[in-house]
Structures are given as structure tokens and as C-alpha cells.
């Protein structure tokens, strides 16, 4: 009788231990490995040859960009700062002295800046990266004690959208002399991505042996590098000394009217 009781007691403890192990394993979240193989370089070298220097100053306002939610704040700041830096280099390459203004609003220019600036260059726009709905699929993990992975996946192609507008102003009057806009959706940029996130449930036993991969951040950085190069290439073509000097007459007239 005692032996039988010992056997029942052992079996009960074994059952409890097994249940505890199962509960522990089920409570563990699967591991997600985020790749970091792409650097956010944002490189561009002016393509046009350096021309003769002029005794004229151009005011460069800080870019005013908005970004989609999937672009990290640090990427936003670097994109904005590199845009200002490279446009400054492009203008210097065209023979102009550049005064960088720590504001994106033309109304914040001081009187002395308005007076000494031949032109002002302002930039605004939206930098958007979104999954192509025609080429992106989502797969959610189903709850389950055994075979649920506990991972939701989105796999597809990241494409750009939004715009960048460059406006050339006469600083004293604040009047626009010219502008051009780049439609980012027209750029041939397509980045494959796999975004993996934890499901609302913890997953089953198999989830402890599953490792998810997420390369969506690398796809974003790669796309931003290409968007940046395309934007700079277009600005380099437009902001030439020949084009900028064509506003000479109108700029003088507008500045003269405000000085009277």
C-alpha cells in the first residue's frame, strides 16, 4: 500500500514538474535578431566643376523636412544636417559665399542678413518610406501551446514617397524668384525588407527555439542613402552659377523697392 502511495506521489510531482517546465517555456518570448549591415552614409560629391568665385553671398536656411514614423529621429537629424552641409558645398562650388541660417523661416532673417544676401535658399518637404502594398504581405502568428512561433512578420518592398521643394528667394522682400520640386515617388528605389515583431501572445513551445530576423532598419538606411544622392544630384543641376545669376535683375529690383 505504501509503495503504491509513493508511486502516486512520484507521478504527481513529475506531472507538476512537467507542467512547470511547459509553463516556463511557453512564457519565454522568441528572440529577434536585428541586422545592422548598412551604414547611413548620405554621401554626395558635387558633379559640376568649381567655377570662379563671386563677391556675392547666399543665405542658406535650415531644411524643414517631415518624416514618416518608421524613420528614426537620429536618421532625421543626420539627413537634415547632411542636406544643409552638401547644399552649402554645392553653392560654394558655384563661387558663392554661404551664410548658414539656424532657422527654416525667412521671417527670422535679421535686417543685416537680408541686406547682404544676394539670394536665400529654402528647402522643405516630406521624406516618406512605406511598404509597397502590392508587394508586401503580413503573416501573424496564431496562438497555440506547441507550434506557435510568437512572431508576426511583414515582408515586402520599401518604396519612397513625399517631395522636396527648393525655393530661391530675394531675402529683403521675402519674394520667391523661382522654385523646383522633386517627387520622391518617381525615384527608382526599391528595398526588400523583413520586419519581425513579437505577437500579442507569447507563443508555444517551439517559440523558444525560434530566432526571428528583422532587416527593416537596414532597408530604411539603404533607401535614405539613395534618396539623398538623388536629391543632391538634382539640386546640383539646378543651383548653378549660370542659373542663379539669371535672377540678378529681379533680385536688385525687389531689394531696391524694400530699401526705399
Curated annotation (Swiss-Prot):
Q: Where is the lipid attached (N-palmitoyl cysteine)?
A: 28
Question: Has the keyword Transmembrane helix been applied to this entry?
Answer: no
| The keyword Membrane belongs to this UniProt entry's keyword annotation | yes
InterPro entries (alphabetical) = NeuraminylLac-bd_hemagglutn (IPR007876), NeuraminylLac-bd_hemagglutn_sf (IPR038531)
**PROSITE patterns from the UniProt entry:** PROKAR_LIPOPROTEIN
> Span of the secretion signal?
1-27
Q: Where in the cell is it found?
A: Cell outer membrane
The membrane topology of this protein is:
Lipid-anchor
Lipid conjugation (S-diacylglycerol cysteine) is at: 28
Gene3D superfamilies noted in UniProt: Putative neuraminyllactose-binding hemagglutinin homolog like domain (3.30.160.180)
Extract one GO cellular component term from the record.
Answer: cell outer membrane
- Sorted UniProt keywords: Cell outer membrane, Lipoprotein, Membrane, Palmitate, Signal
Name of the featured protein = Neuraminyllactose-binding hemagglutinin
Q: Which organism is it from?
A: Helicobacter pylori (strain ATCC 700392 / 26695) (Campylobacter pylori)
- What taxonomic classification does the UniProt entry list for its organism? Bacteria, Pseudomonadati, Campylobacterota, Epsilonproteobacteria, Campylobacterales
Amino acid at each position: 500500500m505504501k509503495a503504491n502511495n509513493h508511486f502516486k506521489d512520484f507521478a504527481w510531482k513529475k506531472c507538476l514538474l512537467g507542467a512547470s517546465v511547459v509553463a516556463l517555456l511557453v512564457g519565454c518570448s522568441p528572440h529577434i535578431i536585428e541586422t545592422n549591415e548598412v551604414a547611413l552614409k548620405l554621401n554626395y560629391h558635387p558633379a559640376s566643376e568649381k567655377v570662379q568665385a563671386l563677391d556675392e553671398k547666399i543665405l542658406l536656411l535650415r531644411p524643414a523636412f517631415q518624416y514618416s514614423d518608421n524613420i528614426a529621429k537620429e536618421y532625421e537629424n543626420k539627413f537634415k544636417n547632411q542636406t544643409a552641409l552638401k547644399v552649402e558645398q554645392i553653392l560654394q562650388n558655384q563661387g558663392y559665399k554661404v551664410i548658414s541660417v539656424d532657422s527654416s523661416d525667412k521671417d527670422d532673417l535679421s535686417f543685416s542678413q537680408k541686406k547682404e544676401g544676394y539670394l536665400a535658399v529654402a528647402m522643405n518637404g516630406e521624406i516618406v518610406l512605406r511598404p509597397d502594398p502590392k508587394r508586401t504581405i503580413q503573416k501573424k502568428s496564431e496562438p497555440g501551446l506547441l507550434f506557435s512561433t510568437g512572431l508576426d512578420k511583414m515582408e515586402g518592398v520599401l518604396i519612397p514617397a513625399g517631395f522636396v521643394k527648393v525655393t530661391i528667394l530675394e531675402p529683403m522682400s521675402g519674394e520667391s524668384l523661382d522654385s523646383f520640386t522633386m517627387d520622391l515617388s518617381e525615384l527608382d528605389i526599391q528595398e526588400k525588407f523583413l520586419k519581425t515583431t513579437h505577437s500579442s501572445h507569447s507563443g508555444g513551445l517551439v517559440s523558444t527555439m525560434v530566432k526571428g530576423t528583422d532587416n527593416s532598419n537596414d532597408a530604411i538606411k539603404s533607401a535614405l542613402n539613395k534618396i539623398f544622392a538623388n536629391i543632391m544630384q538634382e539640386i546640383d543641376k539646378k543651383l548653378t552659377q549660370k542659373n542663379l545669376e539669371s535672377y540678378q535683375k529681379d533680385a536688385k529690383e525687389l531689394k531696391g523697392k524694400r530699401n526705399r
